[in-house]
């Protein structure tokens, strides 16, 4: 599974008007962002070699996410709020929202991953401004494992202040 976004790079960062197409600050914006096509989650098989992207493509460095257990302090902070989790990058757990909480209305989907922009920016300068200092959310389609290669496997959106 790979997440593709179309952030539209400009000289000093990313184009905010393009990023807004996959930004969801309130529940009523969710379906429009999902339908925009500016963020796609695609199912595919692993290969032993990469496909070369077009030369014009802006490709970020590949990042692998390693799951680590919460520290005791993080676990306490995660459970402190009845509604929201920590604003850190994490796999599963409870999502944190910087604006209104966003709920997937269908039980077919599950919240899978949260990426904090400041932690991505620590990887390298090409990530600076990628989520407008916000948080990216990956929602997984639980039926994706039955889908053919190239099918949508969920959706992705960002929130920022």
Please report, for each region that a protein language model flagged, where it lies by residue.
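Preference for intrinsically disordered or flexible, low-complexity segments
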Residues: 1-161
